C-alpha cells in the first residue's frame, strides 16, 4: 500500500521548486498552497525564459485554464523542455471537452509527454474523444464505474499516470486502479481546488514516484479539506482553513486518515 505519510515527509524535507504555467484565476491560490505544503512555487509563462526555468525546476505543472496563443506556445515548449531535461510534468487539462482549443492543447501536451494527468470526469473523457461531458471547467456528469475505466484506459493509451477526480477519485498507471475516498463537499464551493491538486502533485512527483505522487497529493489535499471543514461551515473560512491544514498536517495524520484502496475494473 502507498505510504502517503512518507511521500509528504519527502516533500517537506526537500522543498522542491515547482514551475507552474497556470491560469490567471489560481496563480495566487496555487502558489500559497505549495508554500503551505512545504514546496517552493514559481509562476513563469514567458517563452523566452522557459529553458532557464525548466532547467532549475524540480517539476513542471501545465494548467490550460486560461489559454491564448502565447501561453499555448509556452506550454508546448515547456513540455518539450521537461522531456529534454528529464523533469516530471503534470498536466491539468482544465475545461478539455468544453472547447476544441482546450482539447487540442491538452492532447498536444499529452502526446509530447506528461508524467501525470489530473482532471475531472469530463476532462479525462475528452482525452479519449468522448464529448459533451464538460460544462465550463466543471464536469457535468460523473459515473464512478466509467471513471475507473477512464483512468485505466487513458493511462494505458498515453503511457502516463491518470487521476480522475470526483466524489471518489480514481488513479491508474494502466495496470492498477486506486480509489481515494477522502474529501468534503465544500471543495465544490471554492474555485481552483482541482488546480491546487495539480500544483501539489507537481511537488510530490518532484521527489516521489508518479503513482505514489498522484495518490498522495489527492489524499493530503482532501484530508486537509476534511480537517478544514471541521472548523469552518462556509466557503470563505473553509478556503482559508485549507491552507492552514496543508501546513499543519503531519505524515502521521495523513497515514491515519487516508482512505484508499486498490479496486477492480
UniProtKB/Swiss-Prot annotation:
Q: What Enzyme Commission number does this protein have?
A: 2.7.1.50
Named in its record, the pathway it takes part in is: Cofactor biosynthesis; thiamine diphosphate biosynthesis; 4-methyl-5-(2-phosphoethyl)-thiazole from 5-(2-hydroxyethyl)-4-methylthiazole: step 1/1
Q: Which reaction does it catalyse?
A: 5-(2-hydroxyethyl)-4-methylthiazole + ATP = 4-methyl-5-(2-phosphooxyethyl)-thiazole + ADP + H(+)
Domain of life assignment: Archaea
Signal peptide annotation: none
Chain sites annotated for binding ATP: 118, 165
One Pfam family per UniProt: HK
- Output one GO MF annotation: ATP binding
Report the enzyme's class at the first EC level.
Answer: transferase
Listed binding positions for substrate are: 43, 192
The record's Gene3D superfamilies line, in alphabetical order, gives:
3.40.1190.20
The UniProt entry's GO biological process terms, in alphabetical order, are: thiamine biosynthetic process; thiamine diphosphate biosynthetic process
* Cofactor(s) of this protein: Mg(2+)
Which keywords belong to this entry? Answer: ATP-binding, Kinase, Magnesium, Metal-binding, Nucleotide-binding, Thiamine biosynthesis, Transferase
HAMAP family assigned to the protein according to its UniProt record, in alphabetical order: Thz_kinase
The entry's family comment says: Belongs to the Thz kinase family.
What is the annotated role of this protein in its UniProt record?
A: Catalyzes the phosphorylation of the hydroxyl group of 4-methyl-5-beta-hydroxyethylthiazole (THZ).
- Please state what the protein is called: Hydroxyethylthiazole kinase
Amino acid at each position: 500500500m502507498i505510504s502517503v505519510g512518507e511521500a509528504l515527509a519527502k516533500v517537506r524535507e526537500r522543498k522542491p521548486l515547482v514551475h507552474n504555467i497556470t491560469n490567471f484565476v489560481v496563480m495566487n491560490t496555487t502558489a500559497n498552497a505549495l508554500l503551505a505544503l512545504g514546496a517552493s512555487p514559481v509562476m513563469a509563462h514567458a517563452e523566452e525564459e522557459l529553458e532557464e526555468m525548466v532547467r532549475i525546476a524540480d517539476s513542471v505543472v501545465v494548467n490550460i485554464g486560461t489559454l491564448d496563443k502565447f501561453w499555448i506556445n509556452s506550454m508546448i515548449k515547456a513540455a518539450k523542455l521537461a522531456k529534454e531535461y528529464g523533469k516530471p510534468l503534470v498536466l491539468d487539462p482544465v475545461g478539455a471537452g468544453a472547447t476544441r482549443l482546450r482539447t487540442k492543447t491538452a492532447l498536444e501536451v499529452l502526446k509530447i509527454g506528461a508524467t501525470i494527468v489530473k482532471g475531472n470526469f469530463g476532462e479525462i473523457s475528452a482525452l479519449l474523444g468522448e464529448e459533451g461531458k464538460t460544462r465550463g471547467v466543471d464536469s457535468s456528469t460523473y459515473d464512478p464505474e466509467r471513471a475507473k475505466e477512464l483512468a485505466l484506459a487513458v493511462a494505458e493509451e498515453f503511457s502516463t499516470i491518470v487521476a480522475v477526480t470526483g466524489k471518489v477519485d480514481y488513479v491508474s498507471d494502466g495496470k492498477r486502479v486506486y480509489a481515494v475516498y477522502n474529501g468534503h463537499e465544500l471543495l465544490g464551493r471554492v474555485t481552483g481546488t482541482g488546480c491546487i491538486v495539480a500544483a501539489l502533485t507537481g511537488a510530490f512527483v518532484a521527489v516521489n514516484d508518479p503513482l505514489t505522487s498522484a495518490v498522495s497529493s489527492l489524499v493530503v489535499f482532501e484530508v486537509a479539506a476534511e480537517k478544514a471543514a471541521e472548523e469552518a461551515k462556509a466557503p470563505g473560512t473553509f478556503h482559508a482553513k485549507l491552507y492552514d491544514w496543508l501546513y499543519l498536517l503531519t505524515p502521521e495524520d495523513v497515514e491515519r486518515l487516508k482512505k484508499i484502496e486498490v479496486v477492480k475494473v
